[in-house]
Swiss-Prot record:
One of its GO terms (biological process) is protein modification process. Probable tubulin polyglutamylase that generates side chains of glutamate on the gamma-carboxyl group of specific glutamate residues within the C-terminal tail of target proteins. Similar to TTLL1, may acquire enzymatic activity only in complex with other proteins as it is most likely lacking domains important for autonomous activity. Probably involved in the side-chain initiation step of the polyglutamylation reaction rather than the elongation step. It comes from Mus musculus. Residues 41-384 form the TTL domain. This is Probable tubulin polyglutamylase TTLL2. Residues 479-499 are annotated as: Disordered.
Length: 540
């Protein structure tokens, strides 16, 4: 097919699911193998602070990375900095070409409940109610208090004796903290900035228990806008049976595991749900299929919702380079099988509270790293004869000693190779590429590889797959608007416009989904054009 296939045409393929069983591929244990012939490279280096999840550190060590030690390593001698708190502007400006940060700037527009509500309301007024009807009616307090009161009493008059239900959430808090569910306005209390939303009274129940979905989304860049959705995920259950007659029973109405793991029924074997309060997403979809539900259609609706949500805030993201971010989208399914966006979580929890967490989150972190640093360099080394005979299978743990590419997305980004082939005496080059560090070994090897590939380039014609160019060593994605730019010689900045890889591990590309959306996002976002393409897709 000419061009990247649409989500609608290849839903099963996009999500990597067979027609029957819909099993999700698990990350396999890593094994150690001998290094191939040639000068060995030291491991890549990750940097942490006190907020870095222990699971992230554990996974990186499993993959053969080293932990940064400021006492014995150069201040710039690291490749990945993963922490819970956001980075300062100076850290974004000074990030080096071989480094990655796990946050984009300006993400509160997506993860703060009041900011998200404002952006979605703006998109709804501009592009129509029907397109953005996946969020409940929302009021921001105290700004919208008068509007809310008017709506409350109008609805009360329309419904007569039938109650209406609302939920009030703090704009900045998570894990179910500070939430109030009410039907009587006299019970509404708030201090500070809150959002009040129409409470969804008809959730899809599993064995009479309410649940929601934690969908993991990774945004690897904003120029072009590049969104991946994880095939696996979590389904979180309330631990008491759903009952609108008792709005104060949070174990019945809230699905946050931080609350329900403390409930009296957490360890009990509950109807259908079983013990605990979590399922894997694949188990949930298997349950739906047993009731003749088209789970692929539901997945497709969720992917559209994610794209539309990110589009609401993407134009406001400042220019940054070498960043990525993992988000947790919380989605509730009602009894009409309509998905509703509840909120988007910054730093989704990576704690391991149960065996379901272990199976999902450990693979998730592995696949985030896989998404960022696939072993493309190792495959190129093999072409150049650097792999020892009989060692055609290379483990991920060892391949990461030599890898350093972004998603293998066949782009024309300026690479680390291109930057380091300039004059070694150039002060700018010396500043960007310090000598005698772990990463300096990597840069030197990449330079040798570049010279070899240049000699062989004329002998072979690259094979195209759909609209992707051949895989090559590339830079991480760029981002979008521009309050500031990275400093340094022109050669150290990635070019815009690379075509993303369609998957990595269990992550699948959901945007861009065709040539038109790629062109509409590679040099700044043409939101109107993207919306038009998405509407075509949704109307098929």
């Amino acid at each position: 097919m000419d061009g990247l296939q649409s989500l609608g045409d290849v839903t099963a393929e996009i999500f990597g699911l067979p027609l029957e069983g819909h099993s999700v591929q698990e990350s396999k244990p890593l094994k150690t193998e001998d290094e191939p012939q040639g000068a060995p490279l030291k491991p890549l280096v990750f940097r942490v602070d006190e907020s870095t999840p222990g699971l992230v550190q554990s996974v990186l060590l499993e993959r053969g990375w080293d932990k940064f030690d400021e006492q014995r390593q150069d201040v710039e001698d690291w490749n990945l900095y993963w922490r819970s708190s956001s980075f300062r502007r100076a850290e974004y400006v000074n990030v080096k070409p071989w480094q990655r940060l796990n946050h984009h700037p300006g993400m509160t527009n997506l993860t703060r409940k009041d900011c998200l509500a404002k952006h979605l309301a703006r998109m709804r007024s501009r592009y129509g109610e029907s397109l953005y009807e996946f969020t409940p009616l929302t009021f921001i307090m105290p700004t919208d208090y008068t509007k809310f009161v008017a709506k409350y009493f109008k609805e009360k008059q329309d419904l007569g004796t039938k109650p209406s239900y609302w939920i009030c959430k703090p704009a900045e808090l998570s894990r179910g903290r500070g939430i109030i569910i009410f039907s009587d306005i006299r019970d509404l209390m708030f201090k500070g900035t809150y959002v009040v939303q129409k409470y969804i009274c008809n959730p899809l129940l599993v064995g009479r228990y309410k649940c929601d979905l934690r969908i993991y989304v990774c945004i690897t860049g904003f120029k072009p806008l590049t969104i991946y959705m994880y095939q696996e995920g979590l389904v979180r259950f309330a631990t008491e049976k759903f009952d609108l007659r008792n709005l104060e029973d949070y174990y019945s109405h809230l699905t946050n595991s931080s609350i329900n793991k403390l409930g009296a029924s957490y360890q009990k074997i509950k109807e259908v749900v079983g013990q605990g309060c979590k399922w894997t997403l694949s188990r949930f979809f298997s349950y739906l299929r047993n009731w003749d539900v088209d789970d692929l259609l539901l997945r497709q609706k969720i992917s559209h919702m994610v794209i539309l949500t990110v589009l609401a805030m993407a134009p406001s993201v400042p220019v940054t380079y070498n960043c990525f971010e993992l988000f947790g989208f919380d989605i509730l399914i009602d009894d009409n099988l309509k998905p509703w966006l509840l909120e988007v979580n910054y730093n989704p929890a990576l704690t391991l509270d149960c065996s379901t967490d272990e199976s999902v989150k450990r693979s998730l972190v592995h696949d985030v790293i896989e998404l960022l640093y696939l072993n493309g360099l190792r495959s190129e080394e093999k072409k150049c004869g650097r792999t020892s005979p009989g060692n055609s299978v290379v483990s991920l743990a060892r391949s990461h000693h030599h890898e350093f590419c972004a998603t293998p997305n066949s782009s024309s980004y300026a690479s680390l190779i291109e930057f380091t082939t300039g004059s070694k005496s150039d002060p700018a080059v010396q500043n960007i590429c310090p000598k005698h560090t772990r990463t300096s070994q990597l840069r030197e090897m990449m330079s040798r590889r570049d010279r070899l590939l240049t000699k062989e380039a004329a002998k072979s014609k690259p094979r195209h797959k759909a609209w992707h160019l051949p895989r090559k060593m590339v830079f991480p994605y760029a981002s979008q608007s521009q309050p500031h730019k990275m400093k340094g010689p022109a050669g150290d900045l990635p070019e815009a416009g690379s075509t993303p890889n369609d998957h990595a591990g269990n992550f699948v590309l959901i945007f861009p989904f065709n040539k038109a959306t790629f062109r509409a996002s590679r040099n700044g976002l043409n939101v109107k054009r993207i919306i038009q393409e998405l509407q075509k897709l949704m109307n098929k």
